[in-house]
Design a protein with these regions (language model features):
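Terminal non-domain segments
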Residues: 1-79
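Repetitive, compositionally biased segments used for assembly/scaffolding
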Residues: 84-161
């Protein structure tokens, strides 16, 4: 038997909801009951694999409806900044690179700016990359061990900042 727990979302354990989910996971584990936790919200602020790992969940027990029908597995963010730089040829195309906090800014010659958000500054892994031109957000890519989602922003300039 497998018990399926249906939830909207998960965060950084900022409320009792996350702890209740973890307690449920531990309780089922102690008595040997297979379990899956289903999350139905579109979770893009942070990688769901990082959020569930923070609480100690086994990612094999996590089902996120937004990638369930793909071959992308739930995983913590381990996509390296070096891989991104190589794939997009950023070292050659960028006229200026600077790091501010957990963000690495690449100024490209055509006025496009890429902003990579570090999920772990020490390991140099990323979880998001934003594409900005003339202070307007155009696109954002989301990463775990691979790119798993992309958002496009096509509204008026004032809506994309």
């Amino acid at each position: 038997m497998t018990v399926y727990n249906i939830n909207l979302g998960i965060g950084w354990a900022s409320s009792g909801v996350e702890y209740a989910q973890k307690y449920r996971d531990q309780s089922f584990n102690e008595v040997g009951i297979k379990r899956k936790f289903i999350f139905s919200d579109l979770i893009l602020g942070n990688n769901i694999g990082d959020l569930t790992a923070n609480l100690g969940f086994d990612n094999d027990n996590i089902i996120w409806l937004y990638n369930f029908f793909t071959d992308v597995k739930i995983s913590t963010s381990n996509y390296s900044l070096d891989t991104l730089e190589n794939e997009l040829n950023l070292k050659k195309l960028s006229s200026n690179v600077k790091t501010v906090g957990k963000e690495v800014f690449y100024q490209l010659n055509d006025g496009l700016q890429l902003v990579a958000r570090l999920s772990d500054a020490e390991k140099r892994t990323i979880d998001q990359v934003s594409y900005v031109k003339n202070n307007t957000l155009l696109k954002r890519d989301f990463y775990s061990y691979t790119k798993y989602a992309c958002e496009y922003y096509l509204g008026a300039d004032k809506d994309n900042r």
